[in-house]
Amino acid sequence: MASETETFAFQAEINQLLSLIINTFYSNKEIFLRELISNSSDALDKIRFESLTDKSKLDAQPELFIHIVPDKASNTLSIIDSGVGMTKSDLVNNLGTIARSGTKEFMEALAAGADVSMIGQFGVGFYSAYLVAERVVVTTKHNDDEQYVWESQAGGSFTVTRDTSGEQLGRGTKITLYLKDDQLEYLEERRLKDLVKKHSEFISYPISLWTEKTTEKEISDDEDEEEKKDAEEGKVEDVDEEKEEKEKKKKKIKEVSHEWNVMNKQKPIWLRKPEEITKEEYAAFYKSLTNDWEEHLAVKHFSVEGQLEFKAILFVPKRAPFDLFDTRKKQNNIKLYVRRVFIMDNCEELIPEWLSFVKGIVDSEDLPLNISREMLQQNKILKVIRKNLVKKCVELFFEIAENKEDYNKFYEAFSKNLKLGIHEDSTNRTKIAELLRYHSTKSGDELTSLKDYVTRMKEGQSEIYYITGESKKAVENSPFLEKLKKKGYEVLYMVDAIDEYAVGQLKEFEGKKLVSATKEGLKLDESEDEKKRQEELKEKFEGLCKVIKEVLGDKVEKVVVSDRVVDSPCCLVTGEYGWTANMERIMKAQALRDSSMAGYMSSKKTMEINPENAIMDELRKRADADKNDKSVKDLVMLLFETALLTSGFSLEDPNTFGTRIHRMLKLGLSIDEDESAEADADMPPLEDDAGESKMEEVD
């Protein structure tokens, strides 16, 4: 009975991806086999996990295997597994109508010059079959459904048919590739064996190749008589009897037989001793584990024995994955095995979020085989394993730090993770702090560690100074650094958004308190003369401070004479426990922020004025002469808004600020106000002409 065939269109992005794969020249097409074997291994993991709680799941096919069958007669290569299989809806959704988030991202990565071998990292490895095949047929049987056949030549559509007449799989999936004429090398036994060794040697299920074996069999002429009879007829030869006797004994014929040949006989690499494993073997294992096309940066292979037993191999990649901090995706970087049986990946309880970039495997002797995700959360053994893994990861980072070049690569890729670790991991905070690196006022183009900073501290210096901001360029000429630089103190530039969170938790390093250059309460060592001079200036400018506070009202909490600004007229500092300007910027950028919290944390600004600055001195004279002078009010507003910008805050009303600047330009250029009165109808008034002439003087 012929089954009905349904035709489906490929989802648009998948169609695009297929035409990219088919129409672009890629030199390393061989990765298709790695991807298909990797998918088979995942399907086998799933059925093995299901069978831990329900043994009957394996009834249809008790053996777990991957078979590879090259057929030179039909130019097809088949990859068969006894994994979980797919239902009809799985087939339709997973192979064509629903694009994974990785589809688009993979195409963007390809366009940016990435290697096609990255395909597996984006979850679309199946489509790599079209690198070598013009037609792909997928036959699959799931325990909960009948057997179905998926077929496509990638011409925009695929068909799905119920399979009533084909060979019954029992359970699992068979992918048959009809190879392109120029890709027939993938039917050669030697080539397939090399590829499995290169990419899939460490898959934990037997991968068997259907091989042709030719044997020479010795048989006597009598046995061979029947076969040869027809051929011998009519052939007359004069042979000597003795020779004939010899021939009879030594007759050989070639016999062709087929057999399965297991290609990955290695025992799991983590069960071997680290000293016996070569760098190349670790690299091959890492690649097969992660689908990465590059080698790892560093590896840690260890076992823990005693009350608790487990073995683990941890790898640090060379670069961060494209979706490292995508919270919607569970990172599946550590695979959990129990007594060599794969249990699950993306086990969140095994490693904290800040280490989500570390990849590897853990094989426990003590966990129960039928452990569920729910049980994992309460499991004491797992908590101990996790603690050990974190400790070993930190050790591994210190090992990487011994090589400056490697550590620079590592830090560029994963510094955010270390800073997240400072924020989240109170146990290891002081250790992680030693791994941090920053630019500073004295480090030039190099990065410096907190340890190195401490060794360079001035005599009598008891605090570590830092400034946070949007970029190195934005902070290196900040008014907050003027006094610190003048006195020769080194200041660390913390210009990563996550630094704000990290430094909030890292209060001190080696007993030295971390102090922000942008918050109030910055105390610098001063001589008696400096202190005396400061007191005099405070007294002298007290009146101006009051006037400025009256003009600005609740825009600032208070106005004080500064001892941190040397050249700039003024700056705005935040309370010791409030948000810095940079933190305010970060919080404003968060779509789901709590605005009531923002109001509370960000309203405490103190204006610090520089008594040594000519503008401030002139302003003081005017305020002393007439505290109701209208030009003073305008100048104070302009100085406040400029200070907002130079101190790293954003302007609430940039238009008014712009208008003030334009007004100043007109005054400077002696443009008559009446000429452009219409254009400036909406501008806040600069009051009267007397004010204008006074402003000109200041300018």
UniProtKB/Swiss-Prot annotation:
The UniProt entry's GO CC annotations, sorted and at most eight, read:
cytosol; perinuclear region of cytoplasm; plasma membrane; protein-containing complex
Q: Where in the cell is it found?
A: Cytoplasm
Copy out the induction comment. By gravity stress.
- Extract the GO molecular function terms from the UniProt entry: ATP binding; ATP hydrolysis activity; ATP-dependent protein folding chaperone; unfolded protein binding
Organism this protein belongs to: Oryza sativa subsp. japonica (Rice)
Please name the GO terms of the biological process aspect recorded for this protein, alphabetically. Answer: cellular response to heat; protein folding; protein stabilization
Would you identify the family this protein belongs to, as annotated?
Answer: Belongs to the heat shock protein 90 family.
Q: Which NCBIfam families match?
A: PRK05218.1 (NF003555)
Q: What is this protein called?
A: Heat shock protein 81-3
Highest taxon in the source lineage: Eukaryota
Source taxonomy: Eukaryota, Viridiplantae, Streptophyta, Embryophyta, Tracheophyta
